[in-house]
Swiss-Prot record, chain A:
The keyword Cytoplasm applies. DNA-dependent RNA polymerase (RNAP) catalyzes the transcription of DNA into RNA using the four ribonucleoside triphosphates as substrates. Part of the RNA polymerase complex. This is DNA-directed RNA polymerase subunit Rpo5. It catalyses: RNA(n) + a ribonucleoside 5'-triphosphate = RNA(n+1) + diphosphate. Its EC number is 2.7.7.6. One of its GO terms (cellular component) is cytoplasm.
Length: 75, 396
């Protein structure tokens, strides 16, 4: 099988633990359902991610060095 | 760190609110010009002020600005270009049609192509690179030999070309063996018995039937003996990349998932211009990157490279926000707006108003369009700020 995470188009995805997540949501002052979404069957999703989890994505940004974004795992 | 500046200069620049990339740029310049600490301070303050000043203000309508910033250069793009540009002798849709195709999130692009990079041992020699070409390009019977139908004996005869066989199956030594493989493929696909004599293959329908004989020939032409069915042609080019000189393959037709699994294909750099295939194979984040890359290259090819990348990033963010690729337009983003008036203002006005009336929808007047329609201040920029007098009074 092809290891999707090695492709240059795919940024690093990691599952966020609840504690860090609470901090993030408090920072942005939003509910987790307001985050962008990622499908459960997404090939780049880490194996240990479950529906309802939030993944942290560290992109190699074009405008700054790194951009950290979050996506809620759905369906 | 990696910059040869004094600690004083370094600290002054590091203490600013600039993002990493800008700090590095300032540090590099400071190193090059050999500035003193007080000069560095002056530079850092000026750059920081400029940076803070050019940041997007709260309540700025970034979407509208992006729409205008992409739309205006769009008017300068060629309406219909279908030329052989960019890649050697390959036809790739460019310009406005390509941009529309991208934001519409069309299921298959007009001209699907893949850019296939090779693993080191295949990328250096033309011979080895060709091995990968034959694993990708679909080989059909017409490329392998001549077909003749003998109506009197009810047989289809294939004279396989030995040179072609040897070329396309470089790993097998005898052409008879290759012909055997070809015969097996035909048997498997058509359900007939093939008799082999060297590189000559013969077969026919089980019952003598003129119609069936012709049908077999028809079906024979469609069988893929080697390679990926979707790829009709592969162009091989020697290119200068960040890894030095190497062979890169360009395909007409795409099957991204299949291509990545092929031995010799570099599965970390190979890409595809179909954003849906990228989404299916590599996920939503890769699709977002692909949308940005594709839209930016489309603009650059037309000489419109001064469109800021942030506008395209915003478009890609919106298109991939819900975990799937959504198009911009009636069936995608604009069609899913909450406001009835906003949807009605976009396209097919009467239908939207009628549906809303039937379902008893209400409009909260949160967006821009709704407020323009009813003549209220738009809730953007200063329009979204309410001022109130402080409740405490001071006595003198």
């Amino acid at each position: 099988m092809v290891d999707v995470s090695q492709h240059e188009l795919v940024p690093e995805h990691t599952v966020l633990d609840e504690e860090t997540l609470d901090g993030v949501l408090a920072d942005y002052d939003i509910d987790r359902t307001e985050l962008p979404k990622i499908k459960y069957k997404d090939p780049a999703l880490p194996d240990n991610a479950e529906i309802g989890d939030v993944v942290e994505i560290v992109r190699d940004s074009r405008t700054t060095d790194e951009a950290v974004v979050y996506r809620l795992v759905i369906e | 760190t990696e910059f040869d500046v004094t600690d004083g200069v370094h600290d002054v620049i590091e203490d600013t609110e600039l993002p990493r990339r800008l700090k590095d740029e300032v540090l590099a310049t400071a190193e090059e010009r050999g500035v003193t600490k007080s000069q560095a301070n002056e530079i850092a303050t000026a750059v920081e002020a400029q940076y803070l000043d050019t940041r997007v203000d709260p309540l700025d309508p970034v979407g509208t600005v992006s729409a205008q910033s992409i739309g205006e250069p769009g008017t300068q793009m060629t309406m219909n270009t279908f030329h052989y540009a960019g890649v050697a002798e390959m036809d790739v849709t460019q310009g406005l049609p390509r941009l529309i195709e991208l934001v519409d999130a069309r299921k298959t692009p007009d001209t699907p192509v893949m850019e296939v990079y090779l693993e080191d041992e295949y990328a250096e020699e033309r011979e080895r690179a060709h091995e990968v070409v034959w694993k990708i390009e679909a080989t059909k019977i017409l490329a392998l030999g001549d077909i003749s139908t003998n109506v009197a004996d009810m047989v289809v005869r294939i004279d396989l070309n030995e040179d072609t066989l040897q070329e396309r199956w470089p790993r097998v030594d005898s052409t008879t063996q290759i012909a055997g493989e070809v015969a097996e493929t035909i048997e498997g696909n058509l359900g007939v018995t093939v008799t082999q004599d060297g590189t000559i293959l013969e077969f026919g329908p089980s019952e003598p039937s003129y119609r069936e004989l012709l049908q077999l020939v028809e079906q024979l032409r469609d069988i893929v003996f080697k390679g990926i069915e979707e790829v009709s042609r592969v162009v091989i080019r020697r290119e200068e990349t960040e890894r030095g000189e190497e062979f890169v393959l360009y395909t007409e037709g795409s099957a991204f998932k299949k291509a990545l699994k092929i031995e010799g294909v570099d599965a970390t750099r190979t890409s595809c211009n179909n954003i849906h295939e990228v989404h299916k194979t590599l996920g939503i984040e890769a699709a977002r990157e692909a949308i940005i890359n594709e839209t930016m290259t489309t603009l650059e090819e037309q000489g419109l490279d001064d469109v800021n990348i942030r506008h395209l990033m915003l478009v890609a963010d919106i298109m991939t926000n819900d975990g799937t690729i959504e198009s911009i337009g009636r069936h995608g983003i604009s069609g899913n707006k909450n406001s009835v008036l906003a949807r009605a203002a976009f396209e097919v006005t009467v239908n939207h108003l009628l549906d809303a009336a039937i379902h008893g929808e209400s409009d909260d007047l949160d967006g821009v369009i709704e407020n323009v329609i009813v003549g209220k201040p738009v809730r953007l920029g200063t329009g979204d700020v309410d001022l109130r007098m402080g409740a405490t009074q001071t006595s003198d």
